[in-house]
């Protein structure tokens, strides 16, 4: 009986250990550089304050330093989120859920493609005014980095448990990030570009605070089904991210229409800036 009891205890302990084991690490931050989201905002804002504003058109390399880091972070982070749930493609689910997850995956890949397109668009246009320099080197990095950072560090995209995952102080940090995104879009429509550097610096502080919090916290485990308010918070973050990225896409199309005769042109817009 002793041998049987030992075998039974071993069999019952194994599933418990498997349940308690952490899930595969989420692709929140690139392992090669944990400060990648921080530097993706810090380098562009340095480009705003250090060179003379007229030097950007004379030296395209300065444009690239300001545009490439946030676009590259966003372009890489969303495919990592897409690839981070291998079970999402093999778990059978109802047609409605399968369609929603398909739209989610398609949106992540679209965000990545828009980020790559932004590199070509915003380095092609002329930075011939203080407003354009402020938009490209302060507002645009915040709009690109904050959604990718929120979705990768504060949300679970695992099928069946999708939702907002942060708690305690992290919720306040996330709320401030969402507020900065909304403020950036609102101030841009009002053409209040002089406030863009403050939004960028605030984003820099919040991203650093979030990185420090995540580096000292325990790894995330497999989340349980999220309550309704966490799902609503995720929908808010994802919906705002969609609005941000498709606004950027619209501006990219406007830039290409103004600079390339073969590209379908459109009327000027005030979504990000009306100086192109």
From Swiss-Prot:
Residue ranges, annotated region (Disordered): 1-24
Short name of one Pfam family: DUF2463
Entries under InterPro entries matching the protein: UPF0328 (IPR019081)
Entry's family note: Belongs to the UPF0328 family.
Protein name according to UniProt: UPF0328 protein ECU08_2080
């Amino acid at each position: 009986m002793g041998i049987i009891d030992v075998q039974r205890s071993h069999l019952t302990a194994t599933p418990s250990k498997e349940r308690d084991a952490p899930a595969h690490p989420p692709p929140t931050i690139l392992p090669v550089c944990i400060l990648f989201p921080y530097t993706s905002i810090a380098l562009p804002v340095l480009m705003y304050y250090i060179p003379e504003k007229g030097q950007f058109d004379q030296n395209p390399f300065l444009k690239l330093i300001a545009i490439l880091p946030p676009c590259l972070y966003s372009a890489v982070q969303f495919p990592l989120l897409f690839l981070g749930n291998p079970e999402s493609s093999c778990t059978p689910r109802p047609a409605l859920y399968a369609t929603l997850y398909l739209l989610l995956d398609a949106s992540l890949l679209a965000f990545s493609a828009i980020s790559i397109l932004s590199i070509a668009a915003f380095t092609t246009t002329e930075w011939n005014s203080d407003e354009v320099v402020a938009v490209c080197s302060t507002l645009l990095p915040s709009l690109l980095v904050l959604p990718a950072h929120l979705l990768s560090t504060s949300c679970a995209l695992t099928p069946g448990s999708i939702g907002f995952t942060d708690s305690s102080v992290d919720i306040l940090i996330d709320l401030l990030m969402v507020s900065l995104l909304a403020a950036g879009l609102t101030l841009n429509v009002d053409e209040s570009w002089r406030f863009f550097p403050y939004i960028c610096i605030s984003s820099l502080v919040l991203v650093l605070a979030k990185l420090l919090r995540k580096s000292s916290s325990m790894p995330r485990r497999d989340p349980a089904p999220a309550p309704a308010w966490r799902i609503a918070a995720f929908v808010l973050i994802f919906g705002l991210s969609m609005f941000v990225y498709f606004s950027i896409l619209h501006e990219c199309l406007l830039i290409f229409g103004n600079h390339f005769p073969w590209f379908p042109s459109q009327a000027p817009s005030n979504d990000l800036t009306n100086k192109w």
